[in-house]
Swiss-Prot record:
Protein name per the record: Protein-glutamate methylesterase/protein-glutamine glutaminase 1
Keywords: Chemotaxis, Cytoplasm, Hydrolase, Phosphoprotein
Positions of the catalytic residues: S172, H198, D293
Transmembrane segments: none
Function: Involved in chemotaxis. Part of a chemotaxis signal transduction system that modulates chemotaxis in response to various stimuli. Catalyzes the demethylation of specific methylglutamate residues introduced into the chemoreceptors (methyl-accepting chemotaxis proteins or MCP) by CheR. Also mediates the irreversible deamidation of specific glutamine residues to glutamic acid.
Family note: Belongs to the CheB family.
Source organism per UniProt: Anaeromyxobacter dehalogenans (strain 2CP-C)
Principal subcellular localisation of the protein: cytoplasm
InterPro entries linked: CheB-like, CheB_C, CheY-like_superfamily, Sig_transdc_resp-reg_Me-estase, Sig_transdc_resp-reg_receiver
PROSITE patterns for the chain: CHEB (PS50122), RESPONSE_REGULATORY (PS50110)
Catalytic activity reported: [protein]-L-glutamate 5-O-methyl ester + H2O = L-glutamyl-[protein] + methanol + H(+); L-glutaminyl-[protein] + H2O = L-glutamyl-[protein] + NH4(+)
Top-level class of the enzyme under EC nomenclature: hydrolase
Residue ranges of domain CheB-type methylesterase in the record: 159-349
Record remark on domains: Contains a C-terminal catalytic domain, and an N-terminal region which modulates catalytic activity.
Amino acid sequence: MAPRILVVDDSAVVRMALSQILGRAGLEVETAIDPLVAMDKMRRARPDAIVLDIEMPRMDGLTFLDRVMAQDPVPVVVCSGLAGPGSEVALHALEHGAVDVIEKPRLGVKGFLEDSARRIVEVVRAATQARLRARVRALRPLPRPPAGAQPRPAPRLAPRAGRAELVVVGASTGGTEALRVLLEAMPADAPAIAVVQHMPEVFTAQFAKRLDKLCRIEVKEAADGDRLLPGRALVAPGNRHLSVKRAGGLVAVVSDGPPVSLHRPSVNVLFHSAARVAGPGTLGILLTGMGDDGADGLLELRRAGAHTVAQDESTSVVFGMPKEAIARGAAVEVLPLPRVASAVLAWAR
């Protein structure tokens, strides 16, 4: 049976365009002009995923999102204008349970949606596979050991040929909150970190700024030539590849170029460059996400002597990228998200 998608948008043009795009991909599509109509339709037939606008009459999308997550959680993809203040709203939606974001321009919407059909279908299909209970488990703190219990030993890692120099992280669907959990746990003197998160280009700068406010380390959108330093995390700009080179230290390279593994930025591009440049001094981490971007790169990192970690199935919103890496033998460790940060700290000691 085809996955059932509910498109909630007050624009008839958007509803029609998304219905055609998703319908051609074999998805069953229902539409609603606003959240109140959507709630009535959801009482009759529960969708597998919702595509949601934010600015609508009678009830805004964020209020509707909160109600959905509180009453009967359904994977939600936000499809809204993200430029300027909209990017902050989109971040808020992700924090409140949305699994991904699709950019929607203010003008030329129909043509833009048609041009972005492949990404839209990919994101919505991934949402139908999202497991919201896994997101709850990922964000839940680890239970405290009972009084008198022996402390859990630190992970025993293989001897490292070089010093702990660089952490590289890749993520996609569900990754924005996973990255927040990971980076918030980093101390101010954490090793240099480079991140690729699949997201629209107008979104990454605001995402990095939000993380910077929450974390003890500095977090910024990467610019070409930025130094990768202890206590700093660089986030790949949307629609640009991020790699690393050595020039009196580790330096970020931000570049154009064709998509790799169907993505720009590509996790594989970052991981392959880290394997060449930093090798055994690298820790590679592959978090939740759809598809297989990063799986080959994580395997190359492991072959170069790096320590490698994949997020486990129980805490992955979409167990795609980590699953592929595990299947290829790329992961030295498979860990629930709350234990990934402790693995970083154990490796860096």
